[in-house]
Amino acid sequence: MLERLGLETALRLLIRRFQHTHGARTQYRASPPREHLPRPAQEVIYRVAQECLLNVAKHSGATSVNLSLRSTDKKIRLSVRDNGAGFCADQALSKPKSFGLAGMRERALLLGGTLSILTAPGKGTEVTLDLPAPVVLNGKNSRIVD
């Protein structure tokens, strides 16, 4: 779907499906990158958004979710914030079955990016993905080419 529709449309469809299925009020704001993003960067952004929404549906009980995609000359940032139950991030990351959180972080690292999780029990969760622009592969200063 991502390859056929492009990142912006794929994200909007993902969010629409999430809203329809789970009923949480969902806002999406975007200032898409000025340049075409390489396919690996688009995939990471989409998969992190998808995993965040899946986690909201499975664990948080949130009634409101805000997603934003912003781009500057130095970075591309995806932020997903909810008003749900929150959790203890250190405990969740150390669990043997926390493949989703670990997978998101691994995807970010592969492109020289970072993934941060700001949460606490009862306080909701904010997941922030930062990818360098131009996106780099494995921390090396080289562009990824489609």
Question: Model-found features: residue ranges?
Answer:
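Coiled-coil dimerization/phosphotransfer module
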Residues: 1-146
